[in-house]
């Protein structure tokens, strides 16, 4: 007797691959396996996501040792630091162009910080920056 399939069970059909589906695709989260010429499978290294997270955490522990931070809070702080960095870099670059120079120096960074940050905050930022540069130059 020929085997009959029950109407509830379906055989797998060939489907076209969906966009972003599968290993190693643009949308997949996990990296796929790369093949070498010999055929041995080798895992690809995942691209590292750069973040200021560890530095934000160190500063938090210096200021408030008993306080933690959520991943959402860390993400917001990371975005904030990136934003301030971009603003200072853009302003320092503009100042360098105005003065017809080709190198951004600590003087341009300091002036950019003074222009971007208000009053007392700018003074504290400049003093901390000067302290950090002095510490770096003496350690070299």
Curated annotation (Swiss-Prot):
<keyword id="KW-1017">Isopeptide bond</keyword>
<feature type="short sequence motif" description="SPKK motif 1">
    <location>
        <begin position="6"/>
        <end position="9"/>
    </location>
</feature>
<keyword id="KW-0325">Glycoprotein</keyword>
<dbReference type="Pfam" id="PF00125">
    <property type="entry name" value="Histone"/>
</dbReference>
<feature type="glycosylation site" description="O-linked (GlcNAc) serine">
    <location>
        <position position="127"/>
    </location>
</feature>
<dbReference type="InterPro" id="IPR000558">
    <property type="entry name" value="Histone_H2B"/>
</dbReference>
<dbReference type="GO" id="GO:0003677">
    <property type="term" value="F:DNA binding"/>
</dbReference>
<protein>
    <recommendedName>
        <fullName>Histone H2B.1, sperm</fullName>
    </recommendedName>
</protein>
<feature type="short sequence motif" description="SPKK motif 2">
    <location>
        <begin position="11"/>
        <end position="14"/>
    </location>
</feature>
<dbReference type="InterPro" id="IPR055333">
    <property type="entry name" value="HISTONE_H2B_site"/>
</dbReference>
<feature type="compositionally biased region" description="Basic residues">
    <location>
        <begin position="7"/>
        <end position="17"/>
    </location>
</feature>
<keyword id="KW-0158">Chromosome</keyword>
<keyword id="KW-0832">Ubl conjugation</keyword>
<keyword id="KW-0238">DNA-binding</keyword>
<keyword id="KW-0597">Phosphoprotein</keyword>
<dbReference type="InterPro" id="IPR009072">
    <property type="entry name" value="Histone-fold"/>
</dbReference>
<dbReference type="InterPro" id="IPR007125">
    <property type="entry name" value="Histone_H2A/H2B/H3"/>
</dbReference>
<comment type="function">
    <text>Core component of nucleosome. Nucleosomes wrap and compact DNA into chromatin, limiting DNA accessibility to the cellular machineries which require DNA as a template. Histones thereby play a central role in transcription regulation, DNA repair, DNA replication and chromosomal stability. DNA accessibility is regulated via a complex set of post-translational modifications of histones, also called histone code, and nucleosome remodeling.</text>
</comment>
<dbReference type="GO" id="GO:0000786">
    <property type="term" value="C:nucleosome"/>
</dbReference>
<feature type="cross-link" description="Glycyl lysine isopeptide (Lys-Gly) (interchain with G-Cter in ubiquitin)">
    <location>
        <position position="135"/>
    </location>
</feature>
<feature type="short sequence motif" description="SPKK motif 3">
    <location>
        <begin position="16"/>
        <end position="19"/>
    </location>
</feature>
<feature type="modified residue" description="Phosphoserine">
    <location>
        <position position="11"/>
    </location>
</feature>
<dbReference type="GO" id="GO:0005634">
    <property type="term" value="C:nucleus"/>
</dbReference>
<dbReference type="GO" id="GO:0046982">
    <property type="term" value="F:protein heterodimerization activity"/>
</dbReference>
<feature type="region of interest" description="Disordered">
    <location>
        <begin position="1"/>
        <end position="47"/>
    </location>
</feature>
<dbReference type="GO" id="GO:0030527">
    <property type="term" value="F:structural constituent of chromatin"/>
</dbReference>
<comment type="subunit">
    <text>The nucleosome is a histone octamer containing two molecules each of H2A, H2B, H3 and H4 assembled in one H3-H4 heterotetramer and two H2A-H2B heterodimers. The octamer wraps approximately 147 bp of DNA.</text>
</comment>
<feature type="modified residue" description="Phosphoserine">
    <location>
        <position position="16"/>
    </location>
</feature>
<comment type="similarity">
    <text>Belongs to the histone H2B family.</text>
</comment>
<keyword id="KW-0544">Nucleosome core</keyword>
<keyword id="KW-0539">Nucleus</keyword>
<feature type="compositionally biased region" description="Basic residues">
    <location>
        <begin position="26"/>
        <end position="47"/>
    </location>
</feature>
């Amino acid at each position: 007797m020929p085997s009959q399939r029950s109407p509830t069970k379906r055989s797998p059909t060939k489907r076209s691959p969906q966009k972003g589906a599968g290993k190693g695709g643009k949308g997949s989260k996990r990296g796929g396996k790369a093949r070498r010429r010999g055929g041995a499978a080798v895992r690809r290294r995942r691209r590292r996501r750069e973040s200021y997270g560890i530095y934000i955490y160190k500063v938090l522990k210096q200021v408030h040792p008993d306080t933690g931070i959520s991943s959402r809070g860390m993400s917001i702080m990371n975005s904030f630091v990136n934003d301030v960095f971009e603003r200072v870099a853009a302003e320092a670059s503009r100042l360098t162009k105005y003065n017809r120079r080709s190198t951004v120096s600590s003087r341009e960074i300091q002036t950019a910080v003074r222009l971007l940050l208000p009053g007392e905050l700018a003074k504290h930022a400049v003093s901390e920056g000067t302290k950090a540069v002095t510490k770096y130059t003496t350690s070299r």
